[in-house]
Amino acid sequence: MTNRFPAPDYHFSYRKAPVSGNTINGLGEMSQRRARQVFHGSGARKLEWSALETFFGLTMPLQIYIRNALNRWELRKADGPLARKRTPVPDSAKMSKQLKSIARHAGAGAVGITPMTEYALYEGQTADYQSAIVIALPQNYETMRAVTTVKAAAETVDTYRDVSRIVMALAAHIRSLGWRARAYGESADLLHIPLAINAGIGQLGKHGSVIGTEFGSNFRLASVLTDIPLVMDSAVDIGVDDLCLGCQRCTIDCPADAISERQQWVRGKKKWYVDFDRCVMYFVKTFGCGISVSYTHLTLPTICSV
């Protein structure tokens, strides 16, 4: 069955197109380097595509704009003071289990721990922490079936708010033990996807998002960076590469024709990659799109495990 989504016809365009987002992202580069911010910037540098991002924000319905503003306001609590006395951690495995339990009790759908790497940071940014606790929070499946509409956009923003609250609470708990911890609830400052993959949340899919065993791709990510001693999880192989090679669901569904059938070299690594220039225009038109995340086969409730 073919889903009916808005056509990739745009009432907006650049008079002078900026440098390709694919170039900024390092498409075709054989040497490893850190990513550069290209959209949803943190203000660390002037983005080549900032005009489109501004347009995206200005054309958002008021309810979405307010939700985003409230999320940004709440993230002021991402960091905070440490307890004066540090609680020793003689058993890092026990501490890892406790923190995962706290996160799940707060609503997290999946939790993984991985060493922090500089390649999870954008070029020019620093974050001197030992490890990352990655949280995945599922979105409401039925609501997300309305992708490309304001209804689905509101669900996405609300899920980002909820997962941000989880990581802020978890970071605050770690700081109460006397250990440094900072919550990251947005992708503007941290690349959550590579951390999630390394933490065993899932694998990268053809559509550029993580596919996991519990929720498919229908979830949002946030992370806590910390120095508290923890036991690291490992990346998993759940057969996503083989699945994506034989599946064309997202490539067929994508109105912008932005999803490639083959892996490509990106900043020194061969992986699945979505054409930024094609994707971002449709993303802006449709309140954040979300088609591939919601309609990937493993997202469907009846077949969401492998």
Task: Please state what every model-predicted region is.
Residues 1-233, 238-241, 291, 305:
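Auxiliary alpha/beta "docking" domains used to position bulky ligands
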Residues 296-302:
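Conserved small/polar residues in nucleotide/adenosyl-binding loops
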Residues 109, 260, 285, 302-303:
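A very general structural signal that marks isolated residues within well-ordered alpha-helical segments
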